[in-house]
Amino acid sequence: MAGRGFSWGPGHLNEDNARFLLLAALIVLYLLGGAAVFSALELAHERQAKQRWEERLANFSRGHNLSRDELRGFLRHYEEATRAGIRVDNVRPRWDFTGAFYFVGTVVSTIGFGMTTPATVGGKIFLIFYGLVGCSSTILFFNLFLERLITIIAYIMKSCHQRQLRRRGALPQESLKDAGQCEVDSLAGWKPSVYYVMLILCTASILISCCASAMYTPIEGWSYFDSLYFCFVAFSTIGFGDLVSSQNAHYESQGLYRFANFVFILMGVCCIYSLFNVISILIKQSLNWILRKMDSGCCPQCQRGLLRSRRNVVMPGSVRNRCNISIETDGVAESDTDGRRLSGEMISMKDLLAANKASLAILQKQLSEMANGCPHQTSTLARDNEFSGGVGAFAIMNNRLAETSGDR
């Protein structure tokens, strides 16, 4: 990547590094603010709970003529049993086949509720290697799901946009029949907005959470709010473990419930993962806007350099080049690959296998264009694409949304 820098700072800070440092600083501030809010909300409740527990412990010790040390020793034994999966109420076995299957599901999905953990040395060693392969495979699965989801959403929204143009008479019927005229078609540069995609994913996530909560509330005995809370914690793979579904020994229609629980968690994790990646585009736009505001006081030469074509960056719409050329991703220069390797994004298989010039995003875009009847066009402006065939989830959404396209 070109070493364009910002004038503030002694060494003309590289743009990618400036964005990385700005994001790191904002995350630290976000953590400090979150800690302050949670401390204000939860600290008093924690102190009250501790006071109630000390009173109950003293009353029980006096009522049964037990010393506090003896009672605490017994409670430590119970804590050890709890870590091994033993509960006061009757719960399902943790390490039969179905319990172990639930456990490996929480491992590879990175949810990690924590209600079941390996206790043997062999189990802990196996978990390290099992999780290394399993978590990597699941991340790949989520990325492939995101790729197909973005393609489907873009196809549906483009079809709706075409129908609207036809009804208004802005799009002749014949223009869509001739595949050779795709490059001059009125929709050649049209892409769905990331805001609409975010709204669709948010609606889908809420719908799945509400339906799952309606199932958990009567079966698990949770309140509806607690069920919604569990859905977010599980679907986002935070996985605190304070609430865990399908842990009782017996349920009505047990097989059906466990299957539905698996399906809801799988769908929820996929949707929330996709939503997080779409939101990250908006966060990156905001970072670029902040960087431009911070650099607005620079000399005119620096400002002209700031407005030049950017690589590997999502720019707000107010300063994007609004040409109508559809920019592809397969003409990216090798310098872009080097820049991405230095940026805050993950390195893709394209970077690891230099001989393979077609990345996941390029293949996906080519397939989409073939499905739409448009021949693949290689543009000389590809090296100026703002995502330049990026990597990871960014590569999947590259040039598929209006805000990730270099032609805006």
Swiss-Prot record:
It comes from the Eukaryota. SUPFAM superfamilies: Voltage-gated potassium channels (SSF81324). One of its GO terms (cellular component) is monoatomic ion channel complex. It catalyses: K(+)(in) = K(+)(out). This is Potassium channel subfamily K member 13. Expressed in microglia (at protein level). Residues 95-115, 224-244 dip into the membrane without crossing it. Changing G112E: Acts as a dominant negative when it assembles with wild-type KCNK13 or KCNK12 subunits, abolishing K(+) flux. Homodimer. Heterodimer with KCNK12. K(+) 2 binds at I111, G112, I238, G239. K(+) 4 binds at T110, T237. Keywords: Cell membrane, Glycoprotein, Ion channel, Ion transport, Membrane, Metal-binding, Potassium, Potassium channel, Potassium transport, Transmembrane, Transmembrane helix, Transport, Voltage-gated channel.
